[in-house]
Amino acid sequence: MKTFGRVLTAMVTSFNNDGSVNIENCVAIANHLLDNGSDGLVVCGTTGENPTMSRDEKLALFNAIAKECGHKGSIIANVGSNDTMASAEFVKEVSKIDGIDGLLVVVPYYNKPNQQGQYLHFKTIAEATTLPIMVYNVPSRVGTGIFPTTLVQLHNEYPHICAIKEASGNLMIASEIKRLMPGDDFMVYSGDDGLTLPMLSIGGCGVVSVVSHIAGKDMNAMIQAYESGHNYKAIRIHQALSEIIKAMFITTNPIPVKYAARKIGLPVGKFNLPMCEPTADEEAYIDKALAEYLK
């Protein structure tokens, strides 16, 4: 199966004290991730605090990372919003950038469209680009989710809608997607670090990861072990990752991972409100799980 890679890191964004994006620091973070287990990056996603970034900042960051880091791995630009026409126009701009390998498009949030509305949303965006599209299904943040049957219809009509970041937490949804589309032309990525190994067992091809900021090599090794038939090795790595995975989601993402990335020396900068620093208790929990990675 031709994929974007096994481990795609949903990378944090480095902000200056005034809240603007620090492009130089972001490129440094991207290079670090691609040198330490990540096969690709998702830029300006949830972990990247994209709601606090302007359109121009996103375009500048896509350009910089594609130019400086695109030779090292896949670059996926997050372009989704809950405004279909605005998303389609943004997609046209992003599609002009050399080195962008694909687009992440979330199910529209807050306005909670039904399945027909979701179909029309993705149809409109697909007609605005020829780049591969990864649908992002995350009902916990969106308030609704895309059905496997809707996804099949979209893929059949627009084959470049060819992947999903499945973050519902429900493995039966991923299983149904693979039952309906068993071939190699549709990629299912786990959107939950802790479900990566079980997702592989039902036909998934990798993970869009947060934990890979800290343990990218281990995450990639787990997937490679499974793919090579070394199931017990994969299970051991999965179990060894459990504490850092729990720590990275002790509170709302990206609060823990940005704190942890700073602790390992990455120039992540400040949070932009409404994201903020973890509490003292949360810091202590993260520090305990992180200790092994600071040796």
Description of each model-found segment:
Residues C26, K58, F62, S87, ...:
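A general structural signal for well-ordered alpha-helical segments in protein cores
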Residues E127-A128, R141-F249:
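Catalytic alpha/beta core domains of metabolic enzymes, predominantly
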Residues M1-K2, K295:
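Basic/polar N-terminal segments that are highly enriched at the extreme N-terminus
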Residues N137-V138, I161, N272-L273:
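Glycine-rich phosphate-binding "P-loop"
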Residues V7-S14, H32, N36-S38, E93, ...:
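C-terminal alpha-helical cap/extension of soluble enzyme domains
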Residues N36, A60, A64-C69, E93-I97, ...:
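Alpha-helical structural signal in soluble globular domains
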Residues K2-T9, S14-G143:
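Active-site beta->alpha loop and helix N-cap motifs at the rims of alpha/beta catalytic domains
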Residues G73-S74, I133, C162, D185, ...:
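Secondary-structure boundary/capping signal
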